[in-house]
């Protein structure tokens, strides 16, 4: 990262780092503090880092690594803009003495005030009735009762809550079969929704743990530029092959009148 990415160049980072040795990533590990410091260096003022992470349970206790990492990001100068929850629709085999574990944290860090906020408004309001006006009364200062109509301010769809339930697992995280050669699939929907929320077209999206290339793919699909780094050559090859297949497919579509995103790596 130090050699290839300049200071204050990244608009948005969306990533899910390896955590607590829950999976074997070909024997590789990472230095968290060094990674966090580099993310602060390369992030633009107003840029955002989406850090998706969880904790493992060891000897009856959760490690708490996620909280320690969040506090370290704050020590570096990041704001903790939001603590969101990624709720999975599939679960791992449960322990006998605790409730089913179905979520991970999505920490939203910003370097100063976020410069881009596009809140997704796709939550159906259950009280919406379609009426344009609501009848009512109010009293003047002298006590006189006056009948009036006021505009119905309740919209059909509202901004979603900060707990996102996103399908994950086989044929849910992605339909790209090659991606499942990676041990931990990052759901495309999760990456896409954060990209839409915290960046605009033409912005640079970064993933320092690119894995199978999900963040890069969704950035390209949504007309963002992308940068990805990956220490494992095997996973880097998977990501490149996946993105190559995507580019070939959509070049064919381009000839049929589809407008394609410009892909940068």
From Swiss-Prot:
Pfam families: N6_N4_Mtase. GO terms for biological process: DNA restriction-modification system; methylation. GO terms for cellular component: cytoplasm. Its EC number is 2.1.1.113. GO terms for molecular function: DNA binding; N-methyltransferase activity; site-specific DNA-methyltransferase (cytosine-N4-specific) activity. The keyword Methyltransferase applies. It comes from the Bacteria. It catalyses: a 2'-deoxycytidine in DNA + S-adenosyl-L-methionine = an N(4)-methyl-2'-deoxycytidine in DNA + S-adenosyl-L-homocysteine + H(+). Keywords: DNA-binding, Methyltransferase, Restriction system, S-adenosyl-L-methionine, Transferase. InterPro entries: DNA_methylase_N4/N6, MeTrfase_CN4_CS, RM_Methyltransferase, SAM-dependent_MTases_sf. Disulfide bonds: none annotated. A beta subtype methylase, recognizes the double-stranded sequence 5'-GGATCC-3', methylates C-? on both strands. No endonuclease has been identified for this methylase, although it is speculated it might protect against BamHI. PANTHER family: RNA METHYLASE-RELATED (PTHR13370), TRNA (GUANINE(10)-N2)-METHYLTRANSFERASE HOMOLOG (PTHR13370:SF3). This methylase is encoded on the proviral phage H2. Belongs to the N(4)/N(6)-methyltransferase family. N(4) subfamily. This is Orphan methyltransferase M.BamHII. The gene is bamHIIM.
